[in-house]
Amino acid sequence: MVRIASGEMKERLAVYFIMGSQNSERPAADVLKEALDGGVTLFQFREKGPGALKGADKEALARQLQRLCRAYGVPFIVNDDVELALAIDADGVHVGQDDEDARRVREKIGDKILGVSAHNVEEAMAAVEAGADYLGVGPIYPTSSKEDAKEAQGPDVLRRLREAGITIPIVAIGGITAANAKTVVEAGADGVSVISAIASAPSPKAAAAALAEAVRAARTR
C-alpha cells in the first residue's frame, strides 16, 4: 500500500460527508446510501456525542456503512478511533487537536489516509509535519452539528493557510451549504465537509448533489 497522491486526495475531498447514528433520526445506512447516490466523494464515520453507540454496536454500524461505501468506491474514514479503523481495515482515520497525537496515529495506520483538524497556521504546519494527507479546517461558519465546535473563523482562515505555504489538500468544515460552498473553494479549500447539510436534509441525495455541483462550478472557474 502507498500513500494517497495529493491530486487524488483533492478530488476525494470534493463532497466529504460526516455522520454517525446520532446525526439523523433516520437509519444511518439509509441516509448514507442516498448521499452516495447524490455524489458524496468521501465519508467519515463519526460516532460521538450524546447517544452515540459504543463497543460491538459501534463496530457493527461501522462495518455496515463501510460496505455501502465500498459498493460505491468511496473511501471510508473513521473519526478518532484508530483501533476500530485497524480492526475493520478502514481507508483512514481523522483526528482533531484534542484527539490522539497525529504523529502517533500515522505510525499506527501506516499508509492509510490521515486527516487532521486545524484551526490556524501553527496547527496546520504541525499536522503536515506529522504526516497528514489532508487538513480539515474550520469551523468556517457557525455550526450546531458539533457540540465542541470552536468559534467560526470565516473563509479568510483558508486564505491565511494558503498564503503561509500550506499546499496539502484542505477541506472546509462548519456551516457549509450549497449556497456558500463556492466561497470556501475560492478561498483555498479543495472541497467541503458537511454533517447536517446532508444528514438533516429532506433529501440527502438532492443535498449531496447540490453540494457536488457547487464545488464543481467553483473548481472550474
From Swiss-Prot:
Residues involved in 4-amino-2-methyl-5-(diphosphooxymethyl)pyrimidine binding: Q44, F45, R46, E47, K48, N79, S117, K146
Pathway(s) the chain acts in: Cofactor biosynthesis; thiamine diphosphate biosynthesis; thiamine phosphate from 4-amino-2-methyl-5-diphosphomethylpyrimidine and 4-methyl-5-(2-phosphoethyl)-thiazole: step 1/1
Residues the record lists as binding 2-[(2R,5Z)-2-carboxy-4-methylthiazol-5(2H)-ylidene]ethyl phosphate: T143, S144, S145, G175, I195, S196
Organism superkingdom: Bacteria
UniProt KW Transferase keyword: yes
GO process annotations (BP): thiamine biosynthetic process; thiamine diphosphate biosynthetic process
Enzyme nomenclature, EC number: 2.5.1.3
SUPFAM superfamilies found in the cross-reference section: Thiamin phosphate synthase
Enzyme class (EC, first level): transferase
Residues that, per the record, bind Mg(2+): D80, D99
GO cellular component terms given for this protein: cytoplasm
Reactions it catalyzes: 2-[(2R,5Z)-2-carboxy-4-methylthiazol-5(2H)-ylidene]ethyl phosphate + 4-amino-2-methyl-5-(diphosphooxymethyl)pyrimidine + 2 H(+) = thiamine phosphate + CO2 + diphosphate; 2-(2-carboxy-4-methylthiazol-5-yl)ethyl phosphate + 4-amino-2-methyl-5-(diphosphooxymethyl)pyrimidine + 2 H(+) = thiamine phosphate + CO2 + diphosphate; 4-methyl-5-(2-phosphooxyethyl)-thiazole + 4-amino-2-methyl-5-(diphosphooxymethyl)pyrimidine + H(+) = thiamine phosphate + diphosphate
Keyword Transferase applies: yes
Pfam families cross-referenced by the UniProt entry: TMP-TENI
GO molecular function ontology, one term from the record: thiamine-phosphate diphosphorylase activity
Purpose of the protein: Condenses 4-methyl-5-(beta-hydroxyethyl)thiazole monophosphate (THZ-P) and 2-methyl-4-amino-5-hydroxymethyl pyrimidine pyrophosphate (HMP-PP) to form thiamine monophosphate (TMP).
Family designation: Belongs to the thiamine-phosphate synthase family.
PANTHER family: THIAMINE-PHOSPHATE PYROPHOSPHORYLASE, THIAMINE-PHOSPHATE SYNTHASE
Name listed for the protein in its UniProt record: Thiamine-phosphate synthase
Organism: Geobacillus kaustophilus (strain HTA426)
